[in-house]
Regions:
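Catalytic beta-strand/loop cores that center a nucleophilic Ser/Cys/Thr
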Residues: 1-56
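A short, polar/proline- and glycine-enriched secondary-structure boundary/capping micro-motif
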Residues: 26-28, 72-75, 105-108
Length: 113
């Protein structure tokens, strides 16, 4: 069973950093991820959660959904996996034409079970 080191789960939450927001910020915080933030946020670059495409005569389905057990048993996520697998196997037709322009849409996580 997968158990990441920095996050065990909602029932055994391990706090790594706590901030006291009542104290004023006197120093600019060290941002070690500034380069990554610039790479992924400036210029409108999006990082897809899931995608399909054709490659060398075959079909490809990719998703990075799922980081804990509750995600893997969510019926919506399971249907997403099934649809993607069926597409990759050739059982489900879908338009895999690359998007010329992606419109951003906010998507909320499903409610907790």
């Amino acid at each position: 069973q997968y158990k990441p080191e920095t996050y065990v789960g909602p029932d055994k939450l391990r706090v790594l950093v706590s901030l006291d927001l009542s104290k004023p910020q006197t120093m600019k915080p060290l941002d070690r991820n500034a380069g990554l933030k610039k790479q992924y946020t400036e210029g409108g670059r999006t990082v897809p959660v899931s995608w399909i495409r054709t490659f060398e005569g075959g079909r490809v389905f990719y998703t990075n959904l799922g980081h804990n057990a509750s995600t893997y048993w969510n019926t919506t996520v399971l249907q997403h996996y099934l649809d993607g697998l069926q597409y990759a196997l050739g059982d489900l037709k879908a338009d895999a034409t690359p998007s010329a322009k992606i419109t951003r849409e906010e998507v909320l996580a499903p409610p907790a079970p």
